[in-house]
């Protein structure tokens, strides 16, 4: 402890630019702990300049996975891409990657830690852990995890304090949690939950994100919050009463953002007792276009992806040709949204928007994660 204090004392003597240069090379998962050391470090970790430095170093990458929505068998196709800026113009594109394709990717809960993507549980083998190294494209199997009392299609998953937390609901106010220690590479069951006779009726989590020691898990019509600092205490997050459908959500600049069907892009004001507030600006022109969407943080901005279906190539040109004889493809669009604090609110400005890929029409968004070196 004394050595840590001494190290910070030496670092505190350096100018902001040099400290930021050091922080830009530190894995993002340590930023939350670093921000607790001092007010100055907390401010530096959240400054836009840090994101600019990380972008110059190409430290962070978005990985998007599409799957065949008409075939969930062992023969399903999984297409992986990464978002990259073009060299000739100030535009972006999704570049195809030769990552492995496995059936567990569809049902598994996913989370990115540094440069690796973890696939936890799912079907057909809910006790498996698979790890994809985004730098090499290699896939390896991790330690077998304990079985949950209830087998679900997916679980809430988040990273906190050097550990991956995997959570499932049991009774109304009771959860079951398993923790994977990233350093020791071992699993631990937290608590001894009591089986729930109505467990089969509990919802499956569609996606989840982590923010300040809490895991926010989205299913079809609600968002649950699991407080990891308080023994995985569960609470329901209130949603707008007339707009409960969340198409996608993510954390950017230590704020939870979600796209709602009616109100568009909202952010969660945790200082005002978890009140949803509208993100102002021209970003609100997008939400009517979001057909099958995904969202992730990209160097302090929001990167939003959505599908736009169109018919591109005719198989034959006979007089009786119809839509069934046409090959369908879909354009994948993306927009980069700059986020700025305006008083007590947040303004979202579209910095760039365009087509980033064309994929087979049978594919849908499956995963959208940010990995970093």
UniProtKB/Swiss-Prot annotation:
Ranges for domain F-box: 8-54
InterPro entries documented for this protein: F-box-like_dom_sf, F-box/kelch-repeat_ARATH, F-box_dom, Kelch-typ_b-propeller
Organism: Arabidopsis thaliana
Protein name: Putative F-box/kelch-repeat protein At2g41360
Keywords: Kelch repeat, Repeat
Pfam families: F-box, Kelch_FKB95
Sequence ranges of the Kelch repeats: 116-162, 163-208
UniProt keyword annotation of Signal present: no
Top-rank taxon, per record: Eukaryota
């Amino acid at each position: 402890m004394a050595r840590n204090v001494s190290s910070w004392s030496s670092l505190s003597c350096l100018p902001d630019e040099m400290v930021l240069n050091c922080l830009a090379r530190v894995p993002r998962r340590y930023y939350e702990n670093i921000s607790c050391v001092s007010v100055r470090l907390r401010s530096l970790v959240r400054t836009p300049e840090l994101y600019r430095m990380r972008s110059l170093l190409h430290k962070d990458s978005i990985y998007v996975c599409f799957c065949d929505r008409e075939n969930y068998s062992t023969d399903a196709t999984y297409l992986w891409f990464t978002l990259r800026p073009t060299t000739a113009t100030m535009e972006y594109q999704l570049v195809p990657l030769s990552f492995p394709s496995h059936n567990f990717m569809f049902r598994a809960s996913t989370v990115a830690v540094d440069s690796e993507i973890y696939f936890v549980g799912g079907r057909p083998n809910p006790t498996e852990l698979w790890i994809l190294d985004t730098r090499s494209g290699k896939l390896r199997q991790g330690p077998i995890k304990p079985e949950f009392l209830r087998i679900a299609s997916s679980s809430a998953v988040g990273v906190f304090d050097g550990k991956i937390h995997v959570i499932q609901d049991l009774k109304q106010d009771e959860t079951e949690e398993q923790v994977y220690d990233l350093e020791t590479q071992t699993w631990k069951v937290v608590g001894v939950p009591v089986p729930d006779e109505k467990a089969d009726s509990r919802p499956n989590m569609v996606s989840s994100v982590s923010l300040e020691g809490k895991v926010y898990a989205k299913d079809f019509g609600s968002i649950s919050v699991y407080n990891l600092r308080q023994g995985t205490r569960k609470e329901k997050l209130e949603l707008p009463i007339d707009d409960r459908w969340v198409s996608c959500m993510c954390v950017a600049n230590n704020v939870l953002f979600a796209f709602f069907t009616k109100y568009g892009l909202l952010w969660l004001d945790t200082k005002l007792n978890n009140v949803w507030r509208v993100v102002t600006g021209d970003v609100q022109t997008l939400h009517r276009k979001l057909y099958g969407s995904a969202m992730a943080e990209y160097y302090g901005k929001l990167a939003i992806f959505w599908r736009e279906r169109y018919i591109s190539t005719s198989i034959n040109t006979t007089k009786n040709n119809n839509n069934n004889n046409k090959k369908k493809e879909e354009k994948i669009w993306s927009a980069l949204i700059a986020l700025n604090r305006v008083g007590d609110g947040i303004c979202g400005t579209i910095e760039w928007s365009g087509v980033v890929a064309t994929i087979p029409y049978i594919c849908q968004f499956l995963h959208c994660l940010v990995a970093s070196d």
